[in-house]
């Protein structure tokens, strides 16, 4: 059975991994997530491990760098420049930007472009605004939704925090004609990124502590794209649970 669970409240993409994101009114959803999302990342030249990407977990001020587009980019919705916290705009693939970030990090970095995206888990992350509000209440503050770095913020029909946990294993469809489909795969295990204020870069441990205390360190869900299509703010969202397994006679 398919039921309407809410609508798209906001859409976000993060062109450069761990840098500032951008809110968009609509976006194309492809097999590798939102067009232009996390296609770029800084590679740490001194890291030979399986996850060589520089993130705000290692350089918190990285979230204060803001990708910009100044004319045609390399392709799709990729940025052409990055604005530093001091307001200087540097070419996204220029040596000056790599040198600046490497200086702050303390070792050399190199900008990399991966067409399939650079994701920690799955290509799409979702959270409901009710969940964000509840975490804020538990943490004693009003956290900016950007702390959670979702691609899709959902305004649910019911005021039930953590309702998205119940969608794991099912499918969300977007729009009256099911333009796009996302299979919800698992809950989103959180890291220290949620402690960083996206406006100032200042850390506060209360948000992560609240998530650990009441939700086993999980808030929001991940999904994979099962049908490409267009997403737009205001689009209705429908949920269909996975079919119950049949018992053998």
Language-model features: locations:
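Metal-cofactor-dependent catalytic cores
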Residues: 1-249
């Amino acid at each position: 059975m398919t039921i309407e669970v809410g609508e798209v409240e906001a859409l976000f993409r993060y062109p450069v991994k761990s840098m500032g994101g951008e809110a968009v009114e609509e976006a194309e959803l492809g097999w590798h997530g939102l067009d232009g999302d996390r296609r770029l990342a800084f590679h740490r030249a001194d890291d030979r491990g399986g996850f060589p990407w520089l993130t705000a977990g290692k350089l918190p001020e990285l979230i204060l760098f803001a990708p910009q587009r100044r004319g045609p980019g390399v392709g799709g919705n990729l940025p052409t420049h990055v604005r530093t916290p001091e307001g200087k705009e540097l070419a996204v693939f220029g040596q000056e930007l790599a040198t600046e970030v490497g200086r702050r990090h303390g070792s050399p970095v190199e900008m990399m472009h991966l067409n399939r995206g650079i994701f920690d888990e799955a290509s799409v992350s979702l959270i409901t605004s009710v969940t964000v509000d509840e975490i804020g209440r538990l943490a004693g503050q009003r956290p900016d939704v950007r702390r959670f770095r979702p691609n899709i913020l959902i305004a649910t029909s019911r005021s039930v925090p953590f309702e998205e946990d119940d969608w794991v294993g099912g499918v969300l469809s977007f729009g009256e004609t099911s333009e796009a489909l996302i299979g919800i795969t698992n809950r989103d295990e959180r890291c220290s990124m949620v402690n960083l204020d996206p406006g100032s870069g200042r850390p506060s441990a209360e948000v992560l502590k609240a998530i650990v205390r009441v939700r086993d360190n999980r808030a929001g869900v991940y999904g994979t794209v099962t049908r490409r299509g267009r997403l737009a703010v205001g689009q209705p969202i429908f949920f269909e649970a996975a079919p119950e397994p049949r018992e053998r006679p």
